Amino acid sequence: EYNDNVNKVETFFKKPVYKNKYEWYIGGKIDGINDDNVLIEVKNRMNRLFYRLRDYEKVQIFSYLYILELENARLVECYKKQNNCNINVIEVGFDQDYWDNEIMSKVVLFASMFENFMENRDKRVELADILLGTNPA
């Protein structure tokens, strides 16, 4: 049982994560932070509670923790069925190794590949041809 006083936050937060030719940022709007500086993220489920942290939610929560320099989060999943509301809380702690190896490494790879793509006219034309169906290949 939790007796959190959750402070709703309306601010869009962002933080630079990589710089090459351009500066790359991650950002987002969080649901709230409790009085103990624990990030609160609420997910309203459509069919059922998952009782585990989904990969895409982990990336989202880790990004928020990184941006805000927080260590802990709670994912609150809610499933409403008729007049009942089932709630499950999943505790999430920031893991620097996971952040570096599973998230940031992919952000850096994407950013560098995108910058290379944008500087390569032939690659841009090739993609346009594919998307427009004008590529004979």
Across the structure, where does each feature detected by a protein language model lie?
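Accessory terminal regions of nucleic-acid processing enzymes
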Residues: 1-137
